[in-house]
UniProtKB/Swiss-Prot annotation:
Acetylated. Deacetylation by the SIR2-homolog deacetylase activates the enzyme. Gene3D superfamilies: 3.30.300.30, N-terminal domain of ligase-like (3.40.50.12780). It comes from Yersinia enterocolitica serotype O:8 / biotype 1B (strain NCTC 13174 / 8081). This is Acetyl-coenzyme A synthetase. The lineage of its organism: Bacteria, Pseudomonadati, Pseudomonadota, Gammaproteobacteria, Enterobacterales. Catalyzes the conversion of acetate into acetyl-CoA (AcCoA), an essential intermediate at the junction of anabolic and catabolic pathways. Acs undergoes a two-step reaction. In the first half reaction, Acs combines acetate with ATP to form acetyl-adenylate (AcAMP) intermediate. In the second half reaction, it can then transfer the acetyl group from AcAMP to the sulfhydryl group of CoA, forming the product AcCoA. It comes from the Bacteria.
Amino acid sequence: MSQIHKHPIPTAIAEHALINPEQYHQYYQQSVQNPDEFWGEHGKIIDWIKPYKTVKNTSFDPGHVSIRWFEDGTLNLAANCLDRHLAERGDQTAIIWEGDDPNQSKTVTYKQLHHDVCQFANVLKKLGIKKGDVVAIYMPMVPEAAVAMLACARIGAVHSVIFGGFSPDAVAGRIIDSNSKLVITADEGIRAGRAIPLKKNVDEALKNPAITSIKNVVVFQRTGNASYWKDGRDVWWHDLIKDASVDCPPEEMNAEDPLFILYTSGSTGKPKGVLHTTGGYLVYAALTFKYVFDYHPGDIYWCTADVGWVTGHSYLLYGPLACGAITLMFEGVPNYPGVNRLGQVIDKHQVNILYTAPTAIRALMAEGDKAIEGTKRTSLRIMGSVGEPINPEAWEWYYNKIGNSKCPIVDTWWQTETGGFMITPLPGATELKAGSATRPFFGVQPALVDNLGNPQEGAAEGNLVITDSWPGQARTLFGDHERFEQTYFSTFKGMYFSGDGARRDEDGYYWITGRVDDVLNVSGHRLGTAEIESALVSHPKIAEAAVVGVPHNIKGQAIYAYITLNHGEEPTPELYTEVRNWVRKEIGPIATPDILHWTDSLPKTRSGKIMRRILRKIAAGDTSNLGDTSTLADPGVVDKLLEEKQSMQAPS
């Protein structure tokens, strides 16, 4: 790969940073050598009703996996995100809402949000929702989604947020698995100018005869287009809050009481309901938010994630609100109505901290300077990346173009199951390398092991595991602790297995190489797909690439690359040869793609992740069972790829 140089900590950042390099090392050493002392102190970042005496009580032992933090303490999450800020910053903005339509935006203060949450919490009680009941939330990106989540937390109900892009079948499956008692939705959502039929999807989902627990559907009016209405079951949000009291004392919750279930796709079988509890999760979300984004009071923070993903839970809502931050919620997409929308939103709201995904960055990068046309983005101080490894070229483009070459990028590695950041730079403490997640956060003990579980010391590559618990860790899979142990703790005994591979360089920095099932073995050489993709995307004519392995009778696996070119570029035989030589030059002959498949679009989930499972099957010609495609943003892409594959005559 291209020569990696370090980006030093900018002086302007170092002067005001919350954590400097010395503090990072000191805190980190304390956090791994004496976790009780470290977390005992830092657990105080939030307010406790009954303070904890026990800090950590955890085991990764086979057959006895048990994770408990602050287990004798009590608290309420909503009180931490709202009530405790009222005296000092009740009139400060809590949420800036930017609509899909650039002419629509509004602000919600902490006082207003508190009022709305208390009111809606009383609505939930009136509908028969009790502490411990599960509430399904299938909402667009509007402040009311946050109100619904916080209202659940206020009364001790468990929320299960379902991303607004999921199909009726996916919604039904999640309602059944979690035994939800209520659904909260909207008539429609709006995204990139198009209406999303949320209520219609819920109606469809509830036709499933296995759903018997739902008595009511609360409907928020977003567009005014609700087609079907079932009297007695469906109730309007605005009607319910009319006479609801605004007085709702927060429920006292044990630290280990469930807070939310969030479904994540497994590599096999049905989605897994990842369960997070209240105390450890909020401590971890708040602490990671504060230090990783170097958040200072008054900063305007924008996380582009949907509330339906863990990033939306931890870093759009709970982490920021627990810290009394100003958080921007965006209904739209970064390239609508124009490709410079991201920059326009930054300028309009004077955003200081931006947190987005490589898939968005690459989409803008393909547009070149059009993506920043007419925008200044000078308010930005810190930028972040989440969702998948960011290739160095996209990192540099993001750094130079969006951030005007002055904003540190926090490239965060974490998962739904981890609750918060695991490996990440800290702006005032970490020199950066493009494409590296750098070093572990406090209390996180990563290790690299070979396939037999032997630790790899020094600069090495291997399976990424975590050797001890941290407060934000998921406690179980809802209703299936056996699957929890099987999935995360059975591959390498006594360790949490992330499912990702990584390499550690001579500076101790971690580089995520992609899912372990995305590792190619070509003639006995291990190659991470992320590395080959980075090489491809560094070619000036390539916008996006996805690499998979296909069976090869001599090499074991051949390298099959799906490639999307920048606008205005056309595939030619010359370019085919040029691209193969380019990768050979960047990585070496062993990494040269055997087959290039030109395509306009890749199959992505609605959170922007490329569905490699489908790409592997298409590449191998195994199209009999492509599995569940309901989570794809555009299921039509699959047929298009199959047609392209049929008509392809790969040059020999």
